Amino acid sequence: MDEDREKHVRAKGSDEVDWISKLPDCLLCEVLLNLPTKDVVKTSVLSRRWRNLWKHVPGLDLDNTDFQEFNTFLSFVDSFLDFNSESFLQKFILKYDCDDEYDPDIFLIGRWINTIVTRKVQHIDVLDDSYGSWEVQLPSSIYTCESLVSLKLCGLTLASPEFVSLPSLKVMDLIITKFADDMGLETLITKCPVLESLTIERSFCDEIEVLRVRSQSLLRFTHVADSDEGVVEDLVVSIDAPKLEYLRLSDHRVASFILNKPGKLVKADIDIVFNLSSVNKFNPDDLPKRTMIRNFLLGISTIKDMIIFSSTLEVIYDFSRCERLPLFRNLSVLCVEFYGYMWEMLPIFLESCPNLKTLVVKSASYQEKGENIILPGPRRFLSSLEYVKIERPLKGEAMEMKLVSYLLENSTILKKLTLCLDDSVKKEDSVILKELLAIPRLSTSSKVVVL
């Protein structure tokens, strides 16, 4: 009786059946597919049956830091792809640090991509951890991988796509990825007929002045870029995706965000300033800029759930002094991220959300600016707000107390306001706590919960 047959009845020291040993090889390989390759290889010491089983796992998930020598890493990938070369490959995940001394050899990646395309790979995830060298240009064969479902690339350069056939591609993440020409990205997006999720993280030097995202199937779009106030550019992002449900924008450099036929967005995460800054300030006389901001706000006005940053609120506040804001009638959940800006622009936006039920104030960093804390003029009641949570620990500063007062004194049906005190403030016999609890409340059923 061989060792596997001896082990299959019961686990050591237990009365439970060892079901793992009863599983067929094909199912074990599917289980191992979910582990990093370095851990999969370790199973080879379990028994004779497991000795070569890892070689049949239909996927590779490897980091060059798993190897002491970079050449060993390269040889391992070569050997793995050569073994059982006629079988299909479900995933190919590779992370490497492309140092200068390895440059000649790292171009093997192009050959590996050609190989896995012929093996009908479904998921490609390649990360150049040197982050921004763009040494490696992937071959054009990647554009004709008809089995490909997800493509995630970081720090690489893509060839200009002359022909694209990606009928199965649903997810594409391009992180600090460059194209051989400025039309390459637009062409690639347009030629993916079932693309549902697109994430683009841009570098300050990608040289794409106008990025057009045109997709009839896209449901989720994320656009992120590093911020550099010293860069004054007329960059444009134009989005034409009528089925879009989720939108995340985090880019202070782009001057114009254009939403064409936005459909009905459900959720958005917005941190943009339309390239406005302390140097390049909002100009009420710049009518094209005002029109663009107005159309953008109208485009996102259908959302139900939104995260918005104080930098964006400041632009909205400046815009509101020229024009009336559109109503966000569907918005029921709002999370506001404050970073170093006064909250005085918040009431203006809240009053444009007539059906808002939940407000979360996160990471607020309040600033004192004299006594002019509340916006001048009468404020409208918040007739729908039911729940408020202030996540930043309060210290009792005037700005904080004004925020709490505004919410309690203007919310007609507020049920609960949750906050917490800073560790430097003792809850017992706290003057701040007494002040908070003494604030008049418009809603008779509201509770203040101090965590």
From Swiss-Prot:
Q: Give the Gene3D superfamilies listed for this entry.
A: 1.20.1280.50, Ribonuclease Inhibitor (3.80.10.10)
Where does the source fall among the domains of life? Eukaryota
Record-linked SMART domains:
FBD, FBOX
Write out the ranges of the repeats annotated as LRR. 128-155, 177-202, 224-251, 335-363
- Give start and end of each F-box domain: 17-70
Going by the UniProt record, its keywords in alphabetical order are: Leucine-rich repeat, Repeat
The FBD domain is annotated at 370-421
Stated name of the protein: F-box/LRR-repeat protein 13
UniProt lists the gene as FBL13
